[in-house]
Amino acid sequence: PEILVTPQRATLPGPKFSREELLVHAGGKISEIFGPEFAGQDSYERQVRMPLPPLLLADRVTGLQAEPKSMKTGTIWTETDIDPDAWYLHEDRIPAGVMIEAGQADLMLISYLGIDFLNQGDRVYRLLGCELTYHEHLPKAGDTLQFEIHADGHAKQGDIRLFFFHYDCNVNGTPRLSVRKGQAGFFSDEELAESMGVLWDPLEATPCESPRLSPPKVKNVPTTLSRSQLDSFAAGKLYDCFGDGFEFGCTHTRTPKISGGRMLFLDEVTELNPAGGPWGRGYLRATDEIEASDWFFDGHFMNDPCMPGTLMFEGCLQTMSIYMAGLGLTLDLDGWRFEPVPEEAFELRCRGQVLPTSKEVVYEVFVEEVIDGPYPTLYADLLCTVDGLKAFHCKRMGLRLVPAWPLE
């Protein structure tokens, strides 16, 4: 797809909004920043809002080209500064899922276009899907992400309104992420509760023919992993996580690893099998118990708590990283890191939600290919199931290992 380079701030049209004004959109009276013509929605308990911190990732709106309350098309430009002490940093870079979340101002755009005068507090925003393409490497501390987000159109299915969008993310004029075919809907509580989930069955899917399936580089691939073992992996202690056969990991100084602490979205791996799964090419299953006190419910969104699908995607990438490391693919790659395969489009679909009342998320990796080449790469379908409902699916996601600082 054509990539649009974000114009310089000075030439961008329309109103500008500061971080403080974004906080008002997230948790205050929206008419205070959009003007008195929006006062009619201030009384609604639930509105389409930007997230509150910590998930308010946009730092400023640098331009807005749209007719307020028109429910037509429009464009919004935002920036996100990746501070050196940002809470989400992993290996000095923004995680792939958090990077998608930073392009969150489609929420502010559709709000400015007047969606809540139609929702009237009875309907809430939920992402339905999009197509991602990463470019080059994940941005790092000190970079500023510049987003250009377009509202492309609207539709209606019965009482459900649909919203279509796309966006580009650039750093210093260089494309780093393209999101195409973005779809969101505005749903009642009843409609969300009656969701049939993602219509995808691995038994009916058709993975690629003649797959590249490099064998494990260790004899003893662990079949299960506890939370304490996953914490060890996040801490860079490869042997403490995976055990016998991974002794060489003790020599690593910057081993490829996953995020830890609150950014680790897995409690345990219940199955890891290089010959498992319905395709016989490899399988991993992990679980995460949900608590009402989980940090991501706080402010995402005000009066409408739900787990961002972008963080479910981040959890999926963690399961892929664990699978690659469990096969021994990182043993000889001290100083490397995980990142999405660039210049390939990945399709995400969301059809369920994680609420404070949810009990468990199951993450599954259905391996399609394992390629132990110059940049070891895993391709797999990813499925998240929430209390039995298939909530999230990504088709043929690609994750690879690349040299990190100081090797890059």
Residue spans for each PLM region:
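Short nucleic-acid-contacting surface segments enriched for D/E, G, S/T with interspersed K/R
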Residues: L138-Q146, M312, V354-V362
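Non-catalytic linker/capping segments at the edges of enzyme domains
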Residues: P1-G97, L118, D122-R123, T133-A141, ...
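Glycine-rich and small/hydrophobic secondary-structure elements
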Residues: E148-I149, E364-V367
